[in-house]
């Protein structure tokens, strides 16, 4: 049975939504959950019938979101540190954390190590498009990058799309301010030349292209990727609020909403980040899933499912094999 280490105390809302997510996941798939945190608090939240699927790793130090991640390596009793070490010591196959993302990234890189020929791990997240979803990386791990880093992100993203998303020939694009090869800054232009080596590279893409379903993997540095991600989340939130306001303005609008409610529910599901659960940190030797600090039970459940799917794949082997085929120096 696959064991997953869960940072049970790390989210913005404490342990309750995290444990509820674990419970929901256990009702749908079989795995062993190793809950890292205060056992006295956690045990009261677990139904008796699930006790055989639960283990506890004692940790009382919780990394606050406003604390500096540079201290992560010193705080060996933190929930994130102990969860990472469960994976390092092969007591768990993956970690899921909604805690301090900087501390998680730092500890995962230093304690678990990088894959062969990977200079920088990257956070990859799924964003909705008109047909399905687009994988975007990096969305926050690396604000400053070199062209070889972005090339490695492309290899990792392509491997994830093949192994996890089951896209046989994922279309890979580079985020830029225009589709033409001559557009972009020096980093974008240098990266474009490297990416030409990839058979599935379709060229530059503008920010709007992520939503039209013409690309499967979008490559960018973590600075621009994080802005793109947060902008997308903000636009989705504003559209939802505007729709609610308009629906309340008249009886006909309310009636129309009732008639179209199934379609609205489908739309909500399609754009809801909790449907994806979390973002894998690609490029480290083991599976690390970083969830949003505001994750509710559904997001935690789906993050666990991501971890299980990752551990059952050959993604890291695929990344190392693909990288060995290219010369990027």
Swiss-Prot record:
The lineage of its organism: Bacteria, Pseudomonadati, Campylobacterota, Epsilonproteobacteria, Campylobacterales. GO terms for cellular component: cytoplasm. Homodimer. Probably interacts with PlsY. It is found in: Cytoplasm. Pathway: Lipid metabolism; phospholipid metabolism. It comes from the Bacteria. GO terms for biological process: fatty acid biosynthetic process; phospholipid biosynthetic process. This is Phosphate acyltransferase. Keywords: Cytoplasm, Lipid biosynthesis, Lipid metabolism, Phospholipid biosynthesis, Phospholipid metabolism, Transferase. InterPro entries: FA_synthesis, Phospholipid_synth_PlsX-like. HAMAP family: PlsX. Belongs to the PlsX family. It comes from Campylobacter lari (strain RM2100 / D67 / ATCC BAA-1060). Its main location: cytoplasm. One of its GO terms (molecular function) is phosphate:acyl-[acyl carrier protein] acyltransferase activity. It catalyses: a fatty acyl-[ACP] + phosphate = an acyl phosphate + holo-[ACP].
